[in-house]
């Protein structure tokens, strides 16, 4: 069995619509749209399970970013192990993206560096927010993407590409920077002033 995650679904997409879209790639074992337990409304993503990995791979390669009910869907291999998902290995953070860069454009740009497990541009109700994430299958692909793409111009904007850092890592860095900054300020203050001048 091979499982695909299908995201960015329109709320009215049904299992039957997904079956119609995904069955040409090969025999399907099951399709499940994830729904709110109380309201039964779609949460905007689903899992499509194929009998054969080769069929799932074909669907991923041919249907990613296809439009269903007016929205391009984002397909990736289902990663059920949360520790692997959150480990940060192979994850790249990209910022200062132009408004024209969507999931498909980001995928097309970064797929040159290796196999992509997932790719997403952050959006709100107004559209793309100017940053995104790419999760590569291999750490080497992520490192190559960072080396080549960091500081490059994309649609006249200089982009930042770096290793994805978890919230905990970012907080630890901020704390270290604040401690270093504060001690440096006090040290500089002490060197530049004398006690009498300070009291006046």
Curated annotation (Swiss-Prot):
Gene3D superfamilies: 3.30.70.330. GO terms for molecular function: mRNA 3'-UTR binding; poly(A) binding; poly(U) RNA binding. Keywords: Repeat, RNA-binding. The keyword Repeat applies. Disulfide bonds: none annotated. Signal peptide: none annotated. Residues 170-200 are annotated as: Disordered. This is Polyadenylate-binding protein 1-like 2. The gene is PABPC1L2A.
